[in-house]
C-alpha cells in the first residue's frame, strides 16, 4: 500500500512538472529541411527543400548557402565544388549560368540547382531568410569580389517581403555588408569573434557551431547586444543541448525534431 501511494505521488509530481519553454528561440531550417540529414526528403538548398520546410508551423525561416557565378547570378549550393553533389564539376564561381542551369543533384529526385531569386517569393513577411555568403572559389584559390557579390545580392532581393540576414565568415567582407544588411559573423574561434565585435561595431550577431560554445559564452555575447544563433545539431539530444544554451535561435538539420523540442 505504501509503495502504491508513493508511486501515485511520483506520477502526480511528474505530471505537474513544467515543460521547458523555448518558444522565444527562433528555429531556422538549415538549407531548407536540413543539410546531409537522412530523413530529408529533398536535397538541401533546393526549391523543393525550402518550400517544404516553410510549410511546417512554428518554423521562423530558412538558411541557404549562396555562391556567385561568372555572370553575376547567385546560386544556392553548400559545397565548394560541384562534383561532390551534382552531375557537373568545377566551382560555381568559375562557371557560367547556362552550364549550372543544366545540372542536377545526384539524388533520386534529381533536383535542379536553383538561383536565389527563385526562393525569394516563397517567403512572406512573417519569415526570416538567412543567407550564408560563400566568398571563396576553391578552383582558383581566391576570394571573389565582394562588391560584385553585394550588387548581385541587392538585385536578387529587390522584391523581398521577408526579413533578410546575412552570414559572413570572411572577415574582410564584413565592412561591405554591415551597412546594408543585418550581418552575422560566423566562426568557432572566440578570440576572432571578440576581435571582430570590437572592430566592426555594426555587427548584428554571431553564428557558432553549437558544440563550440558554452551557455555562459552565449550569454556574454547577448550581454554585448549581439544575437546568437547555433548550428550543426542533428540528433534530438544535440537539439536539446543547443536550446538549453539559450541562444536567440538555432539552425538545425532536423526541423521536425527541433519543432517538437522547441515548440
Write out the residue ranges for each language-model feature.
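Sec-dependent N-terminal signal peptides
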Residues: 4-13
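Phosphate-group recognition and catalysis centered on beta-loop-alpha active-site segments
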Residues: 16-263
